[in-house]
Each structure stands twice: as C-alpha cells, then as structure tokens.
C-alpha cells in the first residue's frame, strides 16, 4: 500500500471509467516522476491506451485530465501524452494525517496466519564458521523478521550439518587419539579438516570412519555420547558468534533430527515403486521435471556403496516440517549454487506426494567477493573465518568512533557498544542493500563509512533525529502535520511509501528493496534537516509539525532496525 499513489490511481481510474476506457491489467497507472524537478508523479496510461485503442495519446491524456476535478492536485500534459502530477502541500499533509501514525509501523497481524519455516544459517558442526555463512545468516534473519512483521507465523531453523560421514571421521579421530572430553572449540576445530584430508589417502582410516558413522546412526551409546559432547561444544560456539550479529533461531535442529525418518521414507518410496536401480545405485527418476528446460540427473536415494544419500536427509527434514510442524511454506536461504539440489528435492517432494499444498522456495543468494572480484579468501586460499571478519569490522568501527570528536571522549564501555552497533550495521546493510541473488565486493572501508549507502549512515541519521527530539522535549505530540516547503513535502511523500516498500520486499523475498527505501528516506530527511531550521522556527505549530514528521521518520528507522536486527545507539 502506498497511500498517495493509491489515491492518485483511484482518481485516474474513476476518470477512465467515466470515459469508458478499459482498465489495463499489469500497467502501472501512476509512477514516480522521471523529472522530479517538474512533477511529483507521472502517468503514462494514455500512451498505453493509445496502443490498444489506436488513438492519439495526447488526446486521450487531454480527455482524462478534463474529467478530473481535484483543486489540490495539478494534472498537466507533456510531450506526446505524458501526464505530470503535482501535489499541493495541503493534499500531501491530508493523506499523511489520515493514514500515518506511529501505529502504522507496528507489525501487521493476520487472523489466520500461514506458517512459514525458514531454513537458514546451515553451519556444519565441528567446523569453523566462515564468510560463506554470513549471507545465509543475515538474509535469513531479515526475511524471518520481515515475514513476522507481515503477520505470518514464522519459525527459523538453523538446520545444522551434524550427521553422516563427517561425524564418523571426527569420532574415529577422537578415539584414535584418546582425546578427553569435553573438547574446547580450539581443540575441536582442527580435527575434521585433518581427518578429511587423511581419509582421502588412508583407506583403513576411511573404513574405520565409515564403521563409526554406521554405529552412530544405529544408536551406539559410546558414539552418541562422543557426538553429543562435540555437538554441544560446537553449537555453543556457533551461538556465541551469531549472537554478535543478532542472529538467533527458534529451532536448533540438524540432519540428525531427521535420522529416524530417513529409513522409513526410503522404505515407503520403494513400496510405491518410485525407486529404481541405476548403475549400482538406487534412484528416483526426474526426467519429467526439467530445470529451465534442461533434463536433470536422477535423485540418488541409496549410493552404490549402500549408504543413504544426503539428499534423503533433506527429504526427511521436509517430511517433518510439512507433516508434523504443519508448514504452509518452507523457504531455504541457501547459496544459489545449490539450485539443482533443491530442484531435485522439490521434485521428489511432488512425485512422492509429500509436498501437498506446501509452497517450497529456494531463496538462493550470491557470493561475497574480494577486491579481485573472486570469492573472498585468505592469502593462503582458505575460507575467511566469520569471527575474523566480524572482529575486523568491529575494530574498524571502533577506530571511527575514536577518531570522531563527538564520541572519542565517551566512556570506554559506551564506545565499545557504539562500535558494535556501527560494525554490525555496516556488515548487515552492506549485504542487504544488494539484490539477494547478486554477488558483491567486500570493502570494509566503504562499509563502515558514515557517508554514502551504508549502515552507519542510516544509524547516524537516526541518532541525529534522536538528538533533535531530546532537545525539543515531548510537547510536539499533539496536532496534525502541516507542510510548508518542498523539503517537508518530499519527506512526507517518502514516508507514505513505507508500506509499499515492505510489501514489495516481502513479495520479492528481497530485503534490498526495503534497504534502498530506508536509504532514500535517510537522504530525504537529511536534505530536509539541512534546509529547514526546525529548532529556530518561531511558529510553534509549524515547529511541532516538523518535529512530529521527524519522529515518524525515526519510527520507520526503528522498524527497519528490528527487521534486520541492528541496534540504534543514543549517540555517535
């Protein structure tokens, strides 16, 4: 919903109806002006109608404008038939006062909300979090909170990689070395990389790891105790790191949670005659489910060595989400390079009648790149540690706080808190301002800047408003908003776009739409702030009106902060 655009569209639609012109579907009736210096909005509807009716577009535009009688809005015709729309301050203020209050930005409850389970984060137990987990965690958390804001019943599930051969490799190493449990995270982290590397050249060790895996999956008490011990150590470390980014989950389920369902589903699929032998393996054929017009390989249920393929874990997890948790939608916020895998999983869910009416979506995302435009790596070619990335960002933010004369003399504890707020906003906004499916280059100096399209710029603008409102007190709460110039009018128009930005972001599963809106709002507010002398205004009603307008902008920033999970400090 865009309060102003919706009103303008209704006015033009009423004129079209009176003229007996058709209402064209999928044609934008009112759009932002291509020349904001000439008009607030424009309509190209006459051009679209001219094509269908084979009439002169300017004459159509003239007939539309002639039917409109709204003194507070000026409609004029430009060029071959473009309709320019200029709004009076009184009209914009009226729309704002009738439709916008602080409550407008509260979560939008639904009577019978659908249930969405969002699968994001997806780290592997006993492996260090790396930069690859950054996007899934940040995007997934924001989408979860956006869906909650829209009134859906939302569950966030981290879906840990905590089962299969990697666990057997770790257990085999722990037993062989006689390591005493519980292990610290520093003791645990090197075990899997070393064991994995060794298993590729040591057949005896690989056989031992496979044996330990089988024992674990069959419920062996000793292996379950070892697994639970390092699982707990690893998960506590994951929670610690992700909490810095204000990322949390409703469910800490993993592949292990689905273990009991895997064999039952394999048996069921076989009984239905869906599983066929293929080159020593057992598969479900997907030739009738092409991806982008291309035939996809079959879904492997059981490998040639008799082991159940990991894709069946995703099927078993989906079974739990649909049949037990009653999900109406399941979103997978996972690397775009996993598109084929999820196409296969979703296809199997259809073939086996598991899917039902549940809406399945793979919300793929692009890659974080280094300055060389290649996937971000260390100098040695390894994955960049997520904790290292976070630490570098917070350190860089702290340096900015130390260099700022407004904050350099603050108590150390407060400076650290501000640095965390700034650093986390820098990381999150830098990611979320990009379309989800796009790659982006990691540029720390740019991300922590207080200028430009950055998280710190958004925070700085919000803090500026907080300071303004503190200086003003609370006497401005009463009364309607009145607009007096082009700056407050532009800000009021931008405020009215908030709900539309939320709706578009949700429909596209694209937080970048909302992030771009909030950045544009910040630019608009700062333009207003620098050109309108709020605190020295002698007209008390006008001053209070501007303060109320500022408070609404702050409320939008606070709402956005709750959605992407960043904190706005009191000063910076």
PLM-predicted stretches and their roles:
Residues 100-111, 478:
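Short, basic, low-complexity termini and linkers enriched in Ser/Thr/Gly/Pro
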Residues 94-99:
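Short, charged, solvent-exposed linker or helix-capping segments at domain edges/interfaces
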Residues 1-93, 112-572:
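Non-catalytic interaction-recognition regions
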